[in-house]
């Protein structure tokens, strides 16, 4: 039995959702393109733009860290949670989506800059875990078992 949810979802919401999914797909595609460029350049983007804790020259890494990866294996491991959590965030978040992402990137990067080891830090894990925390909190606050359940299931995978 096939259920048609189209009449239950407004065309405005569908349009917004389509736009958000396109942004998510463009972001993940850009991260893959940057990794390809980084690979061609023998990973020289990582030391140039990665986050270096407690060094002012490493502060730009706060913004660059989520789009840099150490290898294709690293990116492959980050892609499913980026897509799953990103899709759930796109489907459930409000107009505050840009603000949520900005706060997560800056806060996670600042914490790594303050508390991280002296190594160069790269990868989207801070963003993924930030999305996870936001979605769990959102599920609890909204008392949404679907949001909470899907988020926790995605987190376990």
Task: Explain the meaning of each model-derived region.
Residues 2-157:
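A detector for small-residue-rich transmembrane helices and their helix-helix packing motifs
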